[in-house]
Amino acid sequence: MELNYNRVHLCGQAADAPVLSHINHGCAFYRFTLSVLRLSGQADKLPVIVPKALLDAVPVAAGDTVTVIGQLRSFNNKSGQGSRLVISVFAHQLTPGGESPFNQIQLSGVLCKTPVPRRTPLGREICDIILAVNRRYGRADYLPCIAWGAVAT
């Protein structure tokens, strides 16, 4: 896998209808939450950002099953409201339907800080990692990750 690789592939149900998130350089971007079931039966609620042009081509409504291919993105929220580091999936491709549930991400980048190994209250070995994944135009996504089990040591 090459350095600075960032690919997300998800399939789940839209938990809500897309709403306007922001406008950048005259392009509107919409946000919705994708609910993807884990093997345990718990659902991951993942924020997805979609350009209006893509949403016009593939409309999404609450309850729809949709496949999303894109990248994991981050930015620092300096407004003082909500989380400081905002992480979301930026959709490059939307497809109606799909083999739900599916949740896969592939990342390759540079470690920003020394990894921090620790044990959970249940005694599992994990390791906290901050990964920097560069993208075009001098930007980078800083992504907190957790390694589990043998990979964590």
Spell out what each predicted region is.
Residues 1-153:
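Single-stranded nucleic acid-binding surfaces, predominantly the OB-fold ssDNA-binding core
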